[in-house]
Amino acid sequence: MKHEMMNIKPRCITIFFLLFALLLGNYVVQASRPRSIENTVSLLPQVHLLNSRRRHMIGSTAPTCTYNECRGCRYKCRAEQVPVEGNDPINSAYHYRCVCHR
């Protein structure tokens, strides 16, 4: 009986330290990137304003403009969404066109 108790103690201690190490590791990982709710909430209106100023890109990435498409531009040239039908831009399909910017 006494021999069994001596066997159980090291096992319990080992399990205890293993769980403690896992919990401590989890705490350290989560604490390395602190996120407060107040900062996240205060950034939401700013993100919404930036997104509402321009239309969202169709697809995941905008195409890159070639040298020939930007040949006449003096400054910056980038791909933008342009409605196919200019009369009804909301219900129209969009395609990309390279536009010169100043």
UniProtKB/Swiss-Prot annotation:
Disulphide-bridged cysteine pairs: 65-98, 70-77, 73-100
Consequence of gene disruption: Reduced stomatal densities in various organs.
Annotated compartments: Secreted, Extracellular space, Apoplast; Secreted
BP-aspect Gene Ontology terms: cell-cell signaling; guard cell differentiation; positive regulation of stomatal complex development; regulation of stomatal complex development; stomatal complex development; stomatal complex patterning
Tissues with expression: Expressed in immature organs, including leaves, stems and flower buds, but not in roots, shoot apical meristem and petals. Detected in the mesophyll tissues but not in the epidermal tissues where stomata develop.
Signal peptide feature range: 1-31
Effect of residue 88 to A: No effect on conformation or activity
UniProt entry tagged with the keyword Signal: yes
Keyword field: Apoplast, Developmental protein, Disulfide bond, Secreted, Signal
Major site of localization recorded for this protein: secreted
GO molecular function, one term: protein kinase binding
Result for mutant: residue 77 to S: Incorrect disulfide bonds formation and loss of activity. Unstructured protein and loss of activity
Subunit structure: Interacts with ERECTA and TMM.
Domain notes: The loop (82-95) connecting the two anti-parallel beta-strands (76-81 and 96-101) confers the function to the peptide.
The family this protein is said to belong to: Belongs to the plant cysteine rich small secretory peptide family. Epidermal patterning factor subfamily.
Name the record gives this protein: EPIDERMAL PATTERNING FACTOR-like protein 9
Organism: Arabidopsis thaliana (Mouse-ear cress)
Organism ancestry: Eukaryota, Viridiplantae, Streptophyta, Embryophyta, Tracheophyta
